[in-house]
Amino acid sequence: MPSSHPLPPPELRDCPAPAKLNLFLHVTGRRADGYHTLQTVFQLVDWCDMLHFRRRDDGVVARVTEVPGVPAESDLVVRAARALQAATGTTFGAEIAIDKVLPMGGGIGGGSSDAATTLLALNHLWGLGLTRPELMRIGLTLGADVPVFVLGQNAFAQGIGEELTPVELPDSWFVIIHPKQHVPTAEIFSDECLTRDTPVSIIAVFAARTNKFDFGRNDLEPIATAKFGEVARALAWLKQHNQHARMTGSGACVFARFPDAKTAQQVLERLPPEWDGRCVRSLAHHPLAAFA
């Protein structure tokens, strides 16, 4: 229910929407409705889109920046704001600007993270007072990856990705490579060669491991690398520097962990010029965690 607390100032600027990495991703089955059941661990990192919000009193939700290839009406940010309106009956609206830096079709959750940041920021800006579980339920209607960003912690995920258990992960540095190739998620999941029967893992087994970054595999990786040559080449290059390099999500981004920022930066400096790369640090908590 909407909160009776005084409203904050009408504008929220520089609200981060962090990327995620899938440390592993196992496809364990397929439900009758066609959704795949998964197990994965989500790692948040400090590579972020930045969103800016201005409260409106007329109920209008308007995206005021262009996002190439994404019409405003289908943007998860706009849909998240309207889902929050529908769930609460608030009469407030918002103007939303997005500084988009996370690549689309990269497997790092950019659109889902933008939606979660919208839910968290507008929960605060509109004075709604919804709890984190309430926001997570709204987020799930927008996409299976949205709830983990609302949860705001690294997590072991099951089901279609919505059954979340927080996990402690060590402070880490990663190199992420985007091979400038868009990988359609639906195409990967619909491939007849996709492994769909990986045995179920137990969270305690993962949690007890000293090295949590060489656990399991990404079941989507063989499909994506067979279909998209640049993804395969980027992964092969990164494996020269860390044999446990792997793809995140359904691609196209690949990543590897390194012992410190200096080592990660040295690897990044050798990156072939045809790809984009980034040295990132792990996050233990979402920057907007206090908004729910």
Curated annotation (Swiss-Prot):
It comes from Cupriavidus taiwanensis (strain DSM 17343 / BCRC 17206 / CCUG 44338 / CIP 107171 / LMG 19424 / R1). The lineage of its organism: Bacteria, Pseudomonadati, Pseudomonadota, Betaproteobacteria, Burkholderiales. ATP binds at P103, M104, G105, G106, G107, I108, G109, G110, G111, S112, S113. The keyword Thylakoid does not apply. It is an enzyme of class 2 (transferase). This is 4-diphosphocytidyl-2-C-methyl-D-erythritol kinase. Catalyzes the phosphorylation of the position 2 hydroxy group of 4-diphosphocytidyl-2C-methyl-D-erythritol. The active site is at K20, D145. Belongs to the GHMP kinase family. IspE subfamily. Disulfide bonds: none annotated. It comes from the Bacteria. Keywords: ATP-binding, Isoprene biosynthesis, Kinase, Nucleotide-binding, Transferase. Its EC number is 2.7.1.148. The gene is ispE. One of its GO terms (molecular function) is 4-(cytidine 5'-diphospho)-2-C-methyl-D-erythritol kinase activity. PANTHER family: 4-DIPHOSPHOCYTIDYL-2-C-METHYL-D-ERYTHRITOL KINASE, CHLOROPLASTIC. Pathway: Isoprenoid biosynthesis; isopentenyl diphosphate biosynthesis via DXP pathway; isopentenyl diphosphate from 1-deoxy-D-xylulose 5-phosphate: step 3/6. It catalyses: 4-CDP-2-C-methyl-D-erythritol + ATP = 4-CDP-2-C-methyl-D-erythritol 2-phosphate + ADP + H(+). GO terms for biological process: isopentenyl diphosphate biosynthetic process, methylerythritol 4-phosphate pathway; terpenoid biosynthetic process. InterPro entries: GHMP_kinase_C_dom, GHMP_kinase_C_sf, GHMP_kinase_N_dom, IspE, Ribosomal_Su5_D2-typ_SF, Ribsml_uS5_D2-typ_fold_subgr.
